[in-house]
Amino acid sequence: KLVKQQLDKVQIQAEKSAPLSFVQESFKSSSAGILMFLTLIKRYGIDTVISQSNYPGTSVINKASSIFCFLALKLANRRRYSSDDTWCMDRGMGLFAGLNVLPKTAWYTSYSDRVTTEMNRSFLKQLHQLWMKFGLLEDTANLDFTTIPYWGDDAHLENNWSGKRGKALGSMLAVLAHDPDSGLIDYGSANVLQKDESAVVLEFLDFYREGNKKKDNKLRYIIFDRKFTHSEHLKKLDQDNIKVITIRR
């Protein structure tokens, strides 16, 4: 019993995040596989887009490493990162972001509060240009709404239908644009209000054209649910030579 009690009390303190000095060393990691993505990130110049973005850095962690911290969790499939923070001791995940270890959970919350919609939209436009440059976007886009549940005080949020849960709940309504050939998510917004739902397809079209410097509009088809927008907006799409494929549920 005494041994068990002593083991229960053992707590390992994670190191504080700091820029990596890149001295020769060896360590074990359960998430070293995410380092394979660095080759793709470099090949397509995504690291350059991140460095040129408007995202902030912190006093200790620079802009690029800050974004790579979020990428590390996403690529390692850490969905509920606040309930199990053993990842902040994994040296491999820290190496991915150019740090000794990833910062703790509170850092992510604090950083997210500093990120604005304008920063995200500007970043998406830069990525859109990148995908076009490398021919990763074809002439078709899938558009769909998704409900993001909010488990805190949701009095300030609208009730949106969640097909996954089979009910309406206080949540954020987001829209995603997906390229069916490459699998890329080309556009996204989590600020959709119910009164603006039907205009989202036109907002996506504006985004697509604003992010295309060469003005060679490759987009020809948009696929969405039949209730996604109304007839007036469908007429505008037709005038822009955009064909619509609707899905009946």
Feature map (PLM): residue ranges:
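Dynamic "connector" segments at or just before major functional cores
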Residues: 1-167, 174-194, 198-214, 238
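Short, surface-exposed recognition loops or helix-turn segments adjacent to catalytic cores
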Residues: 144, 219-220
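Anionic group-transfer/hydrolysis microenvironments
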Residues: 146, 181, 227, 248-249
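Acidic, His- and aromatic-enriched active-site or binding-groove loops in soluble protein domains
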Residues: 165-167, 242-249
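Short, well-ordered alpha-helical microsegments
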Residues: 198, 230-234
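Short, surface-exposed basic-aromatic patches at helix termini and helix-loop junctions that form
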Residues: 213-216, 233-243
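Acidic, metal-coordinating catalytic cores used for nucleic-acid/nucleotide bond scission
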Residues: 222-231
